[in-house]
């Protein structure tokens, strides 16, 4: 019997998924705590991505992907928020959304606009799954609907 546990390398797709989740958490932290982008990126890269915290191990994440999402959302927020606001139902303002949902939508819309190399279906599915990690109710459906509407608008395609 061999007790050697060989660690399988984490697939790039999994590292990107972990980077997306970490980016949403960082954007949330920035929104509620007022932390700056440089500080939050440095904190996550040094102390969270792939690290153990309070007995839980963060997944190994693609640090470049994480940085790209967080800094891109901050840089492009004035472009992202109006797109999200238009895609929301008429009586919903972006400010009424839960901070986590706002972070998920901003990150997802950023990728739809900036990462044309990533299929719409991958982006929408990943961010809906992140929403499911935080919410049981209607929020994942909202994330799906808003990202799908914006994908049709900016890429001319919906999730397939």
Swiss-Prot record:
<dbReference type="GO" id="GO:0003723">
    <property type="term" value="F:RNA binding"/>
</dbReference>
<dbReference type="GO" id="GO:0005829">
    <property type="term" value="C:cytosol"/>
</dbReference>
<dbReference type="InterPro" id="IPR035926">
    <property type="entry name" value="NusB-like_sf"/>
</dbReference>
<dbReference type="GO" id="GO:0031564">
    <property type="term" value="P:transcription antitermination"/>
</dbReference>
<protein>
    <recommendedName>
        <fullName>Transcription antitermination protein NusB</fullName>
    </recommendedName>
</protein>
<keyword id="KW-0694">RNA-binding</keyword>
<dbReference type="InterPro" id="IPR006027">
    <property type="entry name" value="NusB_RsmB_TIM44"/>
</dbReference>
<comment type="function">
    <text>Involved in transcription antitermination. Required for transcription of ribosomal RNA (rRNA) genes. Binds specifically to the boxA antiterminator sequence of the ribosomal RNA (rrn) operons.</text>
</comment>
<dbReference type="Pfam" id="PF01029">
    <property type="entry name" value="NusB"/>
</dbReference>
<dbReference type="GO" id="GO:0006353">
    <property type="term" value="P:DNA-templated transcription termination"/>
</dbReference>
<comment type="similarity">
    <text>Belongs to the NusB family.</text>
</comment>
<keyword id="KW-0804">Transcription</keyword>
<keyword id="KW-0889">Transcription antitermination</keyword>
<dbReference type="InterPro" id="IPR011605">
    <property type="entry name" value="NusB_fam"/>
</dbReference>
<keyword id="KW-0805">Transcription regulation</keyword>
């Amino acid at each position: 019997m061999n007790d050697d546990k060989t660690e399988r390398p984490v697939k790039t797709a999994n590292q990107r998924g972990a980077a997306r989740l970490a980016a949403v958490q960082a954007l949330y932290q920035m929104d509620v705590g007022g932390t700056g982008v440089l500080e939050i990126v440095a904190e996550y890269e040094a102390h969270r991505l792939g690290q153990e915290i309070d007995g839980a191990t963060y997944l190994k994440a693609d640090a470049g992907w994480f940085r790209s999402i967080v800094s891109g959302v901050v840089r492009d927020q004035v472009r992202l928020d109006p797109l999200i606001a238009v895609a929301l139902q008429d009586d919903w303002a972006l400010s009424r959304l839960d901070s986590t949902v706002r972070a998920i939508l901003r990150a997802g819309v950023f990728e739809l606009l900036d990462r044309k190399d990533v299929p719409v279906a991958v982006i929408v599915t990943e961010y809906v799954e992140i929403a499911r990690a935080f919410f049981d109710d209607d929020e994942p459906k909202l994330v799906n609907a808003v990202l799908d509407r914006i994908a049709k608008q900016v890429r001319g395609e919906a999730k397939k």
